[in-house]
Amino acid sequence: QTIQNFAASDAWAAQFTGLWPNNEKNQMADWLFSLENNTDGSPKGIGLSAWRFNIGAGSAAQGSESGIKDPWRRGEGFLQDDGSYDWRKQAGQQWFLQAAKERGVAQFIAFVNSPPIQMTRNNKAHSEDGLAANLSHDKYVDYGVFLANFLHHFKDSLAIDFDYISPFNEPQWEWKGGQEGSPWNNDELANATRV
């Protein structure tokens, strides 16, 4: 078996720690990504070779109305209610993404816990019933367009070229409100993939 990478995810702490003072977040980034050694020969960091970026669904803007009690399990969203994108969102996560690139991380993976709240069946970033995808039936194409727009923006504007995208994170789970998330059954996965 060949291991493709040694990775970690920015969910959920990076949205906050990426906004900390520069010396603190740079130290954290060194601990995560650095391949260098200190003068005594000890490693500066664990040298992750891949970094996973959580594309938030927008539950943070809903606050307690999101149905997600823990603010650390909510995410900002790039898609706005008027259909525009605010690429300034998820600033803490974007900082760690750039820090990973600057420190030589070789692979980047984007993943989605929930489609944007503007596209979900219940206007929330979690499932009500845990039985089916929390994506409106008429939003499958829009969801694909959203993901494509995300990838193009990060490549064209930030020079981050994601190697992989995971549009369905842990689809077998119910995701009924502990954090952003959506279940997907096999037919829904197939339909979304065909789009």
Label every PLM stretch briefly:
Residues 1-163, 167, 175-177, 182-190, ...:
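N-terminal catalytic cores of secreted or lumenal carbohydrate-active enzymes
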